[in-house]
Amino acid sequence: MKRFLLVPALVLASCNSVYYAAWEKLGWEKRDLLVSAVKSARGEQKEAGEEFQDALTQLKKLSGYHGGNLESAYNKFKAEYEDCEAQATKVRSEIREVDQVARDLFREWEREIRQYENASLAADSRAKLADTRSRFEQLSSTLHAAEASMEPVLRQFRDQVLYLKHNLNAAAIGSLRGKADTIQSDIQRLLEQMNRSIAEADRFIQTMK
């Protein structure tokens, strides 16, 4: 069994090597790719924050329904929820990319330190590696905290979409009013966590220049 499990890992390692080699030909080292990945993750988080706020706006409109096309209002909320799910997937993917590039960068850095003949240069490089790794761990922690903060809100949105799908009436809409306030509090916490993550990404990018 272990022998077969090694095959995907070897294929993945080979793909990563080809990927990095292609970028190196264009003058992009892993350090540059890590900065680019962090910028992408930061951008997707900003977009996610906007999507969650838009979904909350539609939910509030739906909860304040006083006549009109109820199904149309529900469909708008459902569409915003689906946009949130899609954007959350992008955020998760970008964070996985950041983690992968960082791991590969640090492995390469460690290998290259062992190639030094000059002990002083090796020690200096080792200290810089430790500092960069420490700063990255702080960034990674905030990225994953922001990622985790999305799920409670998504679950609540999902529950409302599923419930309203089969109970689209005035009584069900009335029950949304208290839920909207609860979800707003969760979204506020989500946005605060994302803002911390975005600020940490900004600091990390500056130190990598």
Question: Where is each model-derived feature located?
Answer:
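Long amphipathic alpha-helices with heptad-repeat character
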Residues: 41-52, 81-84, 88-102, 143-150, ...
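Extended amphipathic alpha-helical interaction segments
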Residues: 94-174
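Positively charged n-region of N-terminal signal peptides that target proteins for export
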Residues: 1-4
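C-terminal motif of bacterial Sec signal peptides marking the signal peptidase cleavage site
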Residues: 12-14
